[in-house]
Amino acid sequence: MSKLFQVLCWLFIASFPVNVFAAEDGVDKADNAFMMVCTALVLFMIIPGIALFYGGLLRSKNVLSLMAQTMVIFALVSVIWVIYGYSLSFSEGNDFFGGLSQFMLKGISVESLAATIPQFVHVAFQGAFASLTVALVVGALGERIKFSAILIFAFIWTTFAYLPMAHMVWGGGLLAQDGALDFAGGTVVHINAAVAGLVGAYLLGKRTGFGKEAIKPHNLPMVFMGTAILFIGWFGFNAGSAGSANSIAALAFINTVVAASGAILSWVLAEWVFRDKPSLLGACSGCLAGLVGITPAAGTVGIAGAL
């Protein structure tokens, strides 16, 4: 029986389409570790960062639904990404879509490299970006849409909005050929998600109960915790977009701190002038505004530009 079990184990290992005993030639271990940490930080932004931030802004009766939506959307987009999303974004194709040459990550093994890191790490890092982008739209649609509908939307929007935009900007498509610069996702992530959220909110209309009852953030400490997690995760988001632990990553890192700090102060001062006192929600809003603002240029502008 034990011999049969050993044979089955070896057959199972042999069925994998990658060489699990591949050499490490060409991999920079420092860059690899750096990018894996950055990927984990971006994933941390989704679960629990976005879930806590948006959950605190909603009414208490809708918090669990939004958190569940965030987690399931992350899972859905991750599966889409490894099946065909990465291929349509980063393989050779036309101006708008890549091809299907890397369908199900075909042709990618543990020996495959993206610069100085394993290509699997690049797949995971970019997949985290895709999941984050779709999760951002959830906040605009919160308390407006059914669970099943948001999943259908996530599938369609990821396929026909996020993937072509990623290819056009980062995959050698139309905008990349025109010289577009988007260091960490100002276009691919934030403008993309913002337009989807705005159009979705407009088409779906007002939230249930709007105008009939007070709709206030039910838990500001939860919003603060979500903001703090997003702030920390953003270092992986921006610095990781350098692709390695180099001086560009360092510039993106310090620019992230400076931009967020300047935006927090600006928002709080504006509240002091127009509302006589600052607020925690205002400080959190300013922080995220600064982080979003510096994202596309974190690795290209100087400190003064970030401020």
Predicted regions, residues:
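Hydrophobic alpha-helical transmembrane bundles of multi-pass membrane proteins
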Residues: 2-307
